[in-house]
Amino acid sequence: VNTGTREQEVCKLRWDWEISVPELGTSVFLIPADFGGRHERSGVKNGDERLVVLNNVAKSIIDQQRGLSKEWVFPYNGSAMHRMNDSAWKKARVRAAKLWQEENLRPAHPGYASIRIHDLKHTFGRRLRAAGVTEEDRKALLGHKNGSITSHYSGAELGHLIEAANMVSATDSRGPVLTILKRKQA
């Protein structure tokens, strides 16, 4: 929800894909185009290298993972996670719905029970759009194919993308609010 990455990009994220950007005091991840995904054949969706920019929330999570594994950013029993949409994710959804219900004194939206990991990527994209981030920058941050974007970024361009990602940082209470519109059934 803070990086726009796909499930397997998170599960199989490797420390050797991290690139330090000292002029910005941060790092980014560059997932290789031949990344195999869950079955070692799915690869990065658009066939290009995938730049993963970290906003402040994502950076703090990555920093907490340092030292847990020499190879994997998010290890599970010494190797990469297989998938995130498992029983733990389902239990977390139930806990989140219950907490929301307790805080708001009304039932949680039924959608809480069916939120998928990929929905977090969509949420990141929607929040970027609501924050006024340009389409070109949204494509770069979401890893969508864009003919004018390459895997070569200047420090200023990376700084701009980090700034855009921070516009939707979960720690910023001034972040964009999304209103879900639905048509009433006739």
List the model feature ranges, each with a label:
Residues 2-9, 119-145, 152:
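C-terminal catalytic core of tyrosine-transesterase DNA break-rejoin enzymes
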Residues 43, 109, 113, 117-118, ...:
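Residue-level marker of regulatory loop/turn positions in helix-turn-helix DNA-binding domains and
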Residues 16-26, 114, 133-152, 176-177, ...:
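Short, polar N-cap/turn motifs at the start of nucleic acid-interacting alpha helices
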Residues 35-39, 44-45, 49, 64, ...:
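C-terminal secondary-structure termini that scaffold catalytic or DNA-interacting sites
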Residues 3, 8, 12-64:
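Conserved tyrosine-mediated DNA breakage-rejoining catalytic core shared by Y-recombinases
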Residues 30, 73, 116-119, 152:
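Conserved beta-strand positions that form and line the central face of beta-propeller blades
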Residues 53-112, 186:
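Active-site/catalytic core of tyrosine-dependent DNA strand-transfer enzymes
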